[in-house]
Amino acid sequence: MVDFIVFMKKEGRMIRRLRPVFGFKVIRQKKRTLPEVKQFASIFLFRHGMTFFNRDRKFTGWRDSRLTKQGFDDAKIVALRLKDKKIGVAFHTALTRSKQTLKEVLRFHPETFMVIQDDRLFERAYGKLEGLTHLEFVKKHSPKLYDVYHRSYDTPPPGGESMKMVKERVLSFIKDLLKFVKKHKVNVAISAHGNSMRPFRQYFEKFNNKQMMKLYNAYDAVYEFKVKI
């Protein structure tokens, strides 16, 4: 696994490398007042809103690009979709866009008693491609190589991750998540990233790898998965 990268608020400027936070890191916790769910718990999965890098068609990966105004609007739509649900625990990654989106969602959920960070849900690392626009890469190299690095399952870009690598860490997260949900009998919300959502949906919706690679995750969509307690 390549090391995680944290960037300054200025778009795309790297400041340091960190060890990945693989595993649940509790960010906030308060006394639980929410009753345990019965029979089935819900996992609510959604993508962060549009970022400046998304808007400009840049490879984002682990760069800490923040939400645009449209991105906040996307997050507010997700928040409204989940407004009437009961959410006990919420997950985000270390990336600002994930935190900003979750913050909008949780405005309607005073019942949430725990917020957890887990970077196994990080976006796919695009390595040396990060910060380049898609068009810049195609002009410098070729459309064929673009397709290989952008949508190949098992070929990573230079210094980055393949989707196979992303899938491995996401499946590790899902394994721990299912144990957590069954133990605590609670609904959870997850503010994730486009590429980490693909293997997540593959697991619950039973897609093969080829189908998974074609999945599109809209900025304002919410996916609900039921877990038997």
Each predicted region: which residue ranges?
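Beta-strand elements within well-structured catalytic alpha/beta cores of enzymes
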Residues: S42-R47, F91, V186-A192
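Non-catalytic terminal regions with compositionally biased, polar/charged low complexity
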Residues: F7, I15-L18, F22-Q39, F91
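Phosphate-coordination/substrate-recognition cap region in phosphate-metabolizing enzymes
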Residues: T33, V37-A41, K76-Y146, F204-N217, ...
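Loop-to-helix element that buttresses phosphate recognition and phosphoryl-transfer chemistry
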Residues: F44, M50-T101, V105-F108, P157-L171
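Extended, charge-rich low-complexity interaction segments
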Residues: K144-S162
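Short, well-ordered beta-to-alpha junction loops that form the rim of enzyme active sites
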Residues: G49, T93-L95, R120, R151, ...
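Active-site-adjacent alpha-helix immediately C-terminal to a catalytic or transition-state-stabilizing loop
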Residues: T33-E36, F52, K99, L171-I229
